[in-house]
Each structure stands twice: as C-alpha cells, then as structure tokens.
Design a protein with these regions (language model features):
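A short helix-coil junction within the Rossmann-fold of NAD(P)-dependent oxidoreductases
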Residues: 153
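Alpha-helical interaction segments
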Residues: 44, 74, 89, 135-136
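Alpha-helical transition-metal enzyme core signature, strongest for iron centers
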Residues: 13-20, 41-56, 97-107, 139-150
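Amphipathic alpha-helical recognition patches that constitute DNA-binding helices
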Residues: 8, 39-43, 95, 131-138
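N-terminal leader/capping segments at the start of a protein or of a new domain
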Residues: 6-29
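Short, helix-capping/interhelical loops that line the mouth of catalytic, cofactor-
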Residues: 1-8, 51-106, 110, 118-122, ...
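Acidic interhelical loop/turn segments
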Residues: 21-36, 104-140, 157-171
Length: 172
C-alpha cells in the first residue's frame, strides 16, 4: 500500500490537533483564562483552531457559512481573529472541545477529498502566494507551535509533560 501526500499531511495535522486537545484536557481549569506573559490559554487555543478551520476552507465565503459558525454565531460574531487588533474574547472548555471536533472532521474530509492537482494549486486563503500543499504543512507547524507553547505552560504549572503523538489522532 502506497502512502499518499494527502495521508501524510492528514496524519500530521491530526497529531498536531490531538496535541492541542491534550493541552485543553490537561490545563488546570482555573488557568484556562489566565495570562502568562502573553495571551490567555483559551485565546491561544481558539486562535489555533480558528486558523486550522480557516486555512482548510475553500474560500472566506464558505468559511463564514459553515453550520458550525452559524450555530455559534454569538462566539464568532465579528471574527476578531481576522482583524489586526488584540483579541478580547475568552472561550470555555466545552466550546473549545466542540471546535476541536469540528476541526478534526474538517481535516479528515478536506484531505480525503483533495486531489494531487489541487494540492499544487494556489491557496486562496493567504495573501502571500503559496500552494495548498505548503499551506497545510505550514498549518501543521502553526498548530504544533501553539501546542508546544501551551504544553510548556502546563509543564510549568503542573510538572507534567505532554505525551508525544507521532501520527494521527490519539487521546490521552
């Protein structure tokens, strides 16, 4: 069985998302809205999920019209993440877990449906010209960057390290 580029990207995006989920699950509950010399934990998680969701979308129009966004319009409201301003909203753990579930399904569907030709096409979701293939790898790095940021916070607060997830979805 030959492993495709789509499968590799999907497995690595899922591993990064699972690492972020591990952060949400292991963050001490009283710390979810606390700042630690940067943004509150819940804002970092939301930012990471938001751009996962955004970059896996075909266009801004389809991004805004997703059922998940419509059902949670009070949370997405003004889409502050797309503006050049400091975020102000805080997010509850239950919502963050729902958003993780939404992103997990979107990763699986997007990478199962995309063709080799589409991977080489320009990704319209970025101002800078970049292929979808490179955008997905950049997205994986972005997710892992923030998971590491939050994982270090958790380790400092609890003394516990995150478990390494090599490939695919795994829960601890």
């Amino acid at each position: 069985m030959q492993t495709t580029t789509q499968t590799i990207i999907k497995q690595q995006l899922l591993a990064s998302l699972a690492t972020l989920k591990q952060c949400v699950d292991t963050c001490p509950k009283e710390q979810i809205h606390e700042k630690h010399n940067d943004y509150p934990f819940s804002q970092v998680v939301f930012h990471t999920l938001f751009y996962c969701d955004f970059y896996l979308s075909k266009s801004k129009g389809t991004f805004f019209k997703q059922d998940f966004h419509i059902k949670n319009k009070n949370i997405f409201a003004d889409y502050e993440e797309l503006e050049y301003r400091l975020p102000t909203k805080l997010y509850e753990i239950a919502f963050l877990n729902q958003y993780i579930g939404h992103c997990r399904k979107k990763i699986e569907k997007t990478l199962e449906d995309i063709t080799d030709i589409e991977l080489k096409q320009n990704a319209k979701m970025r101002e800078k010209e970049i292929t979808k293939e490179e955008l997905f790898i950049d997205l994986c790095r972005h997710m892992q960057h923030h998971a590491a940021q939050l994982g270090l916070r958790i380790q400092i607060l609890t003394g516990n390290e995150l478990q390494w997830i090599t490939s695919g979805w795994k829960e601890y």
